[in-house]
A protein has these predicted regions:
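A short glycine-rich, His/Asp/Glu-containing loop-to-beta-strand
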Residues: 1-14, 20, 80
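Conserved hydrophobic/aromatic beta-strand scaffold that supports enzyme active sites
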Residues: 1-5, 23, 43, 51-53, ...
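Tight coil/turn sites that cap or link beta-strands
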Residues: 7-10, 49, 55-57
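Short beta-strand His + acidic residue motifs that chelate non-heme Fe in jelly-roll/DSBH
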Residues: 13-15, 33-34, 54, 60-67
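A short beta-strand-loop-beta hairpin characteristic of the jelly-roll/cupin
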Residues: 11, 20-48
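Beta-hairpin (beta-strand-turn-beta-strand) motif
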Residues: 28-29, 36-38, 56-59, 76-79
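Double-stranded beta-helix
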Residues: 4, 40, 61-102
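A short, sequence-level motif marking secondary-structure junctions
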Residues: 48-51, 91-92
Length: 102
């Protein structure tokens, strides 16, 4: 678990965290988390006290659209190592056989 400061107007690379489940708690600021739902990008705007869960292998990126203030988030992962796999673009995970999304 660790605390991360996201600089004003920062945008991360598109990435996923491999087999790691990622839990994010927003301490301050209004970071946004961007995913792809198979039709286009989906943006989740957050506020202090919000919680975001990112399942394993789900491509996403983080953004702090605030031009002046950093965002502070606490990140907990289900693996000991911090896995980050950078991607050229966001994409939706294919449906699993038998129904349901990954």
């Amino acid at each position: 678990m660790g605390e991360t400061y996201v600089s004003p107007e920062a945008v991360s690379d598109n990435h996923h965290h491999g087999e790691s489940e990622t839990a994010i708690f927003v301490r301050s600021g209004n970071p946004e988390f961007v995913f792809h739902d198979g039709h286009g990008e989906v943006r989740i705007a957050t506020a202090p006290g919000d919680y975001v869960f990112v399942p394993p292998y789900v491509p996403h990126r983080e953004e702090n659209p605030d031009p002046s203030n950093p965002a502070v988030i606490v990140i907990a992962r289900s693996t000991q190592e911090a896995i980050v796999v950078n991607l050229p673009a966001l994409y939706a995970l294919p449906d699993k056989p038998g129904g349901g999304s990954a």
